[in-house]
Amino acid sequence: MKTLSTLPRGVLFAAAVLVAQFAHAQDRLVPLQARPDAGSVQIVPNSFSYHAFGLAGLRGPAPDLRPAGPLEALKISPAFEESVPVVPSPGFYAGDATNPGDGPTIVSAEFHPIYVNKPPSHWGNPARFLIDLGASEFIHVLDQYVGVIARDRYTLGASFAAQYPIPANNTLLPTDILNLVHAAAAAGGSGYGHLYHVFLPMGVDMCFPATATSPAQCYSPDNPATFDFCAFHSSATFSDSVGHVLFSVEPYQDVSGCSVPPTGSANNQLIDSTDNTLSHETSESITDPDGDAWWVHNFTILNGNEIADECIRAQVTSTGAVYWDYGNVDLNGHPYTFQPEYSDTVHGCTYRPI
């Protein structure tokens, strides 16, 4: 988890839409405009934190890397999951996440896609995935962390068609993301009942500038020297009435280092690359929205990992190409290719709750 103490000012404004209409707006896009050059909306100092999702097999929290092989449907044995041995003290399961500070989680929420400058099909069909994710059994793997087992807690809210000026260098900064998120949250709602997903179009990079203690961190497939992450989830508290906002950023995922293989996935490379990352960031946003809830706190190589970080797996091909390596799984009756999540209950990665 990283925190930025100060940020330049940004500005934004949302299309005038009544929040009450959003329950009926799931099948349409709400127009949204955000400008970086007018107004003075600010965030509360030290309130902007983020956790990045590293590249396949290259950076990040010790991913499992194996030679490429055929992708198969994943089958999880109930007998295995229900017979996890107890480790006698002082032993422990190194991957188990804890929440010693009782940080908040997302018990229920509306998901809000923000599509920047392109139609939703540019990224596949993220809204369909979010609907299926919220209605699936898989989402209940997270119940153990949020402490609630009720169904239908995560649903699709308003989706936004955002127009935003892209700089000449094709690189957005944190202030640009905050402009977009603030504009959407001003219309759609804020707090722990809303989770915004910002989708950046192909060819647009996103960077956290260098600081005195760390180099620049970027999604920049066109510049391998700074290409450090595929996506991230974050939160920030704005100093106006919008207040606290939870969000993730998914740049274009059908690029080397962030994608599933070109063949063998449930849908196609674009759809499943997008949905795999979206699942990763959504699960971590729910269980650790502000960076102070569920992650590995013990002092092992896994320290700092959130529950999705622990279950990333990549494959390397004979040509040296690296892809995410997961099987095909049904969500709400529709097939997808995406990663499992870590479960403290089974002390391992799983697609189904116990």
Regions found by a protein language model. Name each.
Residues A25-A97, Y115-V116, N125, G134-I149:
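N-terminal zymogen propeptides
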Residues E110, P119-Y164:
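Active-site-surrounding "flap" and adjacent substrate/cofactor-binding loops of secreted or lumenal enzymes
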Residues K2-V11:
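Bacterial N-terminal signal peptides that target proteins for export
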Residues P215, Y219-D272, D288-I354:
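Metalloprotease/metallohydrolase-associated module, dominated by Zn2+-dependent proteases
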Residues L270-S283:
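Short alpha-helix carrying the canonical HExxH Zn2+-binding catalytic motif
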Residues N117-S121, M202-C207, Y252-G257, E281-E284, ...:
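Solvent-exposed loop/turn segments at secondary-structure junctions
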Residues R151-S235:
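Active-site-proximal segments of metallohydrolase catalytic domains
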